[in-house]
Amino acid sequence: MFDIGFWELVLIFVVGLVVLGPERLPHAIRSVARFVSAAKSMANSVKDELAHELKVQELQENLRKAEQMGMEELSPDLKASVEQLKQAAQSVNRPYADVSAKNEATSSSSSDATHQTEATKTSAANTKSE
C-alpha cells in the first residue's frame, strides 16, 4: 500500500516521539493502525463489490449474445452462463406470498400437532386416574 522502507519508518517514529512525547505516541500509533485497517477493509469491500457487479454484467452480456445468436449455436460456456443467469433471475423473482404461505402452513401444522399431543396427554392422565 505505502512504499515505506525501514529507515523512513524509523524517522517517522523518531519525529513522532519528539512531537507527541512518550505518553501520547502509543495512542497515536494505535489510532493510525485502526485507520489503516479500516481503509484496507473498505478497499477490499469495494473491490469485492465491483468484482460481483462485473460478473453480473458479464452474464447479462452473454445472455444478450445468446438471444441474438440463437440458443442452438451457443458454446457450452455461454449455455452455462445463460443457465446461471436464469437461475439467479428466478431466485430473485420469487414472490413473497409463496414463502409466507409456506410459513403459515408450517406453523399451523405444528400448532395442530401440539394440540393433538396435549389432548393425548390429557386423555392418558384421565385413564390413569380411573
UniProtKB/Swiss-Prot annotation:
The keyword Cell membrane applies. Keywords: Cell inner membrane, Cell membrane, Membrane, Protein transport, Translocation, Transmembrane, Transmembrane helix, Transport. Its main location: membrane. GO terms for biological process: protein transport by the Tat complex. It holds the Pfam family TatA_B_E. The chain crosses the membrane at residues 1-21. GO terms for molecular function: protein transmembrane transporter activity. It is found in: Cell inner membrane. Residues 112-130 have a biased composition (Polar residues). It is a single-pass membrane protein. GO terms for cellular component: TAT protein transport complex. Residues 85-130 are annotated as: Disordered. The Tat system comprises two distinct complexes: a TatABC complex, containing multiple copies of TatA, TatB and TatC subunits, and a separate TatA complex, containing only TatA subunits. Substrates initially bind to the TatABC complex, which probably triggers association of the separate TatA complex to form the active translocon. Belongs to the TatB family. Part of the twin-arginine translocation (Tat) system that transports large folded proteins containing a characteristic twin-arginine motif in their signal peptide across membranes. Together with TatC, TatB is part of a receptor directly interacting with Tat signal peptides. TatB may form an oligomeric binding site that transiently accommodates folded Tat precursor proteins before their translocation. This is Sec-independent protein translocase protein TatB.
